[in-house]
Each structure stands twice: as C-alpha cells, then as structure tokens.
Amino acid sequence: MTKRILVPIAPGTEEMEAITIIDTMIRAGFQVTTASAAFDGSLTMKGSRGITLTADCKLVDVADDEFDVIALPGGIGGAEVFRDSVVLVEMVRQHKYEGKLLGAICAAPALVLIHHDLYPDALMTCHPSFQSHIADACWRPKRVTLDVNHNLMTSQGPGTALEFSIELIIALCGKEKAWQVAEPMVTNPTLHYHEMGKRT
C-alpha cells in the first residue's frame, strides 16, 4: 500500500525544508499531501524567504485522514503558526498515540513538540539556535536523530533537510528504497544519522 505523507505548511515555513521533504517523498513513490495551517485558510502563502508556497488543501480538510508520516518543516514563522494551530497539535498528538512516525526539523521540534510537551522524554535535535528549548538529557547534537522508542525523527535545518528526508524513507521502507531515491539524486544517505533507543 502506498505510504501517505502529510507536510503542513504555513506563512513563514522554511522553503528548502518543505520542498526537499515533498520532492523526496514523491520520488519515493509516496502520496504526499501539503496542507495549509494558515489561520486565514489561504492555500497560497509566502515562506520564510519570500518564496510563494501553495498547499493542496486546508489542514482542517484532512484532520481526520490517516497518514503514515507527518513531517513538520521549520522556519520560525511557520513553526509558530503550527504551535498555535489547535488542529495541527491535536493531529500530532493523535499521530503519536497511534505510534506512527513523526518528523520535525529546524525550529519545529522546539516550538511545536517541546512547547506542547508532546514528546517529553524523547531524544531529539533541532536548529542549534533553539537548543536551549530542549532539556540537556534529551538533546542530541546530530544532524538527524531518530528516537525509535518514540518513533520520532528530528533534524537541524535547511542544510540537513535532504538527509532528514532520506532517513524518513529508510524508516518507512528500508535502505534499499532509500538508495533507489538517493542514487539518481547523487546523494549519499546515512552520513550523519544517529539512531537512539532499541527496536522492538
């Protein structure tokens, strides 16, 4: 069955992170939905660098849908919108409750996950400028970190977005699929990957 991926976007979303996640997931053959968390319901918005982003639908329209992964791009403005979106926070909470894989990069781990205490004991990374939001016991200074005990993958910023995306593919479908995606992109997965916890 085709994996379903949700990538929320909002005004101020980091464009490189969002587009890299979306593009890489499509290359893997996954069904990708981009959903706007904008408070005014608009589907078209400006990202953190002023680039226009367009969502497939409003987040509320897919709030009850099932996704294999929710992947949260960063960008301070976008992450703040995510933080303040009741719909998104509840979707993440339910996603975690169901034991599904969640990804968050850049500012999103700190401004969304930590702010709402969604993964209080999980090991994670984020953009280094937000390290102070994460408890020392939970902080991992790696470009990509997977806490398998919490099914949570986090990453640091625009420069790590491709590694993050490839590692999401590995977590979903294994390394063979990831290499099928990575090779024509002329990239090498798992260079800076750090997995914590024990697989059950």
Question: What do these predicted ranges mean?
Answer:
Residues 35-57:
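N-terminal beta-loop-helix "entrance" segment that forms/cooperates
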Residues 3-13, 24, 28-37, 56-58, ...:
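Active-site-adjacent pocket-lining segments in enzyme domains
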